[in-house]
UniProtKB/Swiss-Prot annotation:
Gene this protein is translated from: dagA
Native organism taxonomy: Bacteria, Pseudomonadati, Pseudomonadota, Gammaproteobacteria, Alteromonadales
Name of the protein: Na(+)-linked D-alanine glycine permease
InterPro entries the UniProt entry points to: Na/Ala_symport
Keyword Transport (UniProt): yes
Listed GO CC annotations: plasma membrane
Amino acid sequence: MLGGAVWFPYVLLGVGLFFTIYLKFPQIRYFKHACQVVSGKFDKKDTEGDTTHFQALATALSGTVGTGNIGGVALAISIGGPAALFWMWMTAFFGMTTKFVEVTLSHKYREKTEDGTMSGGPMYYMDKRLNMKWLAILFAVATVISSFGTGSLPQINNIAQGMEATFGFAPMATGAVLSILLALVILGGIKRIAAITSRVVPLMAAIYIIGALAVIFYNAENIGPSFSAVFMDAFSGSAAAGGFLGASFAYAFNRGVNRGLFSNEAGQGSAPIAHASAKADEPVSEGIVSILEPFIDTIIICTLTGLVILSSGVWNEKFQTHFERSAMSIIKGDYTEENQTQREDLYKYLNGQKSNIETFTGNIEVVNGEALSTGFTVLHSRSIAEDVRFGITEKHKYTGVVEVIDGMPTDDSISLVGKSLVHSAELTTKAFKRGYFGDSGQYIVSIGLLLFAFSTAIAWSYYGDRAMIYLLGHRSVMPYRVFYVAAFFWASFADTTLVWKLAAVAIVVMTLPNLIGIMLLRKEMKESVDDYWVKFKKDNEK
């Protein structure tokens, strides 16, 4: 998969590092000014645009603060260990500069549409400034695909599953209610979207932050060791701990950067579409506002999630769970965590290094869910699974022969359950139960997941309809919005795996052209920044 390619994180960080040095660390030098601009201190009357600086920031944040902040951080830590959090920070730090550049250029080349609203984004500077219409079309098509694959379908799918697991609500019922609410919001256009997100984003952030702090302070004695693990393992990889079998530097780096990108979308070119709607005479001023976005999304919210998971100790603890085929492998031989030689071999195997481990191929005799055969070990979520049982359903235990080829049962209807490490939102939920709120902490995750995911769907609908305007004109917007809502409802009870995989490729197809574009316009960007400060100082001397 392109998004998981070894070179992709290096390209992403490399561009951010280049602009950080080239523009002399704007994420540090302009941070205070960004807070002043977003507060409205320098606003002028009759400035062209659809939203205020704060509303544009809130809309962009509603697109970035999503399931990645809850499940994505947990997934990164479960795969890459504590070190993955460090590389998420690096992605955010350099991403603040990348975001500054892409937003400034997108705002600079925005256009007014037939209905009087603004439309901007990387496709406009690719077309109008670089004269690369084919690249602009490619970016816009990828944006439309991503609006479904990352912004809509997996969001409602996660919401529906979470509501069913926590409250017992039927997925279709959840989908129906939220689809109606989604339609009421997005059919009103950017002004209604901005009005809603500017209220929802602060509320959902406050709820989640309070819940996270309740866990972190409850486990205050583990805060120091958690930070120590993050920094000590950053350049060496995460050592084995508890049920966690360890992760190499490459795994920690790759997962941290990828999850960081998925969370704050720096370099992807999506958030600039929202910022292009802002009322601003100077594109650079809106670019400066966008510096706050990765900071809030990743440095604050993702860090809180990471500390909740690490300080509570659940990240390397085994729980009873259903095994996902994508995170499972059956290997030849009987392995235990107590055997140091076997642990070292498992570390190599799980990190793609040369090892003596072979995947299991053969038949496993099962009676009443329990395996009678020996000579194999089940791995799940980078841990040795314990108390493994085979079944057709949760209540129906399997009896018969399970055929396994290359480490995987050939019959998809046979499920495996047992004790292993867990990941994604399930891991975050376990962690939130280890605080002052006890088991009630799971409701904070469910409510957070609901608000985060729903707001992401709202923001991405706007990104998609601006891309449709560029591709097919204003008349395509309403059919797109109707189809977006219909697909949103369908995904509440359907399998969206294929769309998710397609979107993972689409994200890269968005990101690479955008990174190429901003690199080609680096000199123009520097000149724009210099001109902005000359004019700003002159205006404020009056």
